[in-house]
Amino acid sequence: MYNMMETDLKPPAPQQASGGNSNSGSNNQSKNSPDRVKRPMNAFMVWSRGQRRKMAQENPKMHNSEISKRLGAEWKLLSEAEKRPFIDEAKRLRALHMKEHPDYKYRPRRKTKTLMKKDKYTLPGGLLAPGANPMTSGVGASLGAGVNQRMDTYAHMNGWTNGGYGMMQEQLGYPQHPGLSAHNAPQMQPMHRYDVSALQYNSMSSSQTYMNGSPTYSMSYSQQGAPGMSLGSMGSVVKSESSSSPPVVTSSSHSRAPCQAGDLRDMISMYLPGAEVPEPAAQSRLHMSQHYQSASVAGTAINGTLPLSHM
């Protein structure tokens, strides 16, 4: 039974092959059929017909394309007087062709364009610039994507949507480079403390960045809250207020609590010099804030209390 099935299945294969051969043979016959009318030869074809045969006999190993290149270069070097007999012969052949085939019309055959190697491996949509190295461009794209991802994460940490950080930065004049803030936050913390405690707040975005960027800074900032408020209200009670122990922050939730809009404005206004506060009080407040900042950086605070060496 299996032998019968094998004999039944075997014959169609050669039939298909013969059918394919017949199709290819019919295509070749249609191309080389005598019914197909060829174009009349131009002057270059008339001249190169004898020259091609001669050059092929002299160089039997030379490819036909190389022969055509050399013949084209030689034809361009010929003068008009040398080309004249071949031009006349081409005109005669064309007139004869029009007499024999009055209804002839040239119909160029569409050739399928083969993709070159460089076209096969280029990115779709022309992403690579002309002459660009695919390897280097891929590395640059991956680095750019990583930076954008870090920036998006940093924006979400601050509670802004994608793109909001850039708008706040442009409108409020944030002085720090955005590419450094997310990547080099630990190295830039001392500079943040100096800019915030010793100077005034430039913008709401910078204050929110500082509050969310570093938990250690948030603790030191909240510890400065009580002396700062006492200095903002009256400059004469500095010593009595600073002698009391400030509150100790024990969790990250407490450090993130002052990030509300109203509290943030109060803390910003606390550091701004008021009209009723005299200038010596403002200078002493600046000195105290610098002292607390240096103490928090050096790690001299013990059990959440601040030293009283400034008294």
From Swiss-Prot:
Highest taxon of the lineage: Eukaryota
InterPro entries named among the record's database cross-references: HMG_box_dom, HMG_box_dom_sf, SOX_fam, SRY-related_HMG-box_TF-like
Instruction: Indicate whether Chaperone appears among the record's keywords.
Output: no
Q: Which SMART domains match?
A: HMG
Main localization category: nucleus
Pfam annotation, one family: HMG_box
Mention one GO biological process in which this protein takes part, according to its record: epithalamus development
Residue numbers of the DNA-binding region are 37-105
Composition bias of kind Low complexity appears in 15-32, 233-255
- Could you name the Gene Ontology cellular component terms for this entry? cytoplasm; nucleus
Instruction: Give residue numbers for sequence motif 9aaTAD.
Output: 266-274
Tell me the GO molecular function terms: chromatin binding; DNA-binding transcription factor activity; sequence-specific DNA binding
Spell out the SUPFAM superfamilies in the cross-references. HMG-box (SSF47095)
User: Residue ranges of region Disordered?
Assistant: 1-40, 232-259
Going by the UniProt record, its keywords in alphabetical order are:
Activator, Developmental protein, Differentiation, DNA-binding, Neurogenesis, Nucleus, Transcription, Transcription regulation
Q: Where in the cell is it found?
A: Nucleus
**CDD domains per UniProt:** HMG-box_SoxB
Notes on the domains: The 9aaTAD motif is a transactivation domain present in a large number of yeast and animal transcription factors.
What does it do?
Transcriptional activator. Functions as a switch in neuronal development, participating in the differentiation of embryonic neuroectodermal cells into neural tissues by making the ectodermal cells responsive to FGF-neuralizing signals. Downstream SRRT target that mediates the promotion of neural stem cell self-renewal.
Protein name as catalogued: Transcription factor Sox-2
Q: Which organism is it from?
A: Xenopus tropicalis
Taxonomic lineage of this organism?
Eukaryota, Metazoa, Chordata, Craniata, Vertebrata
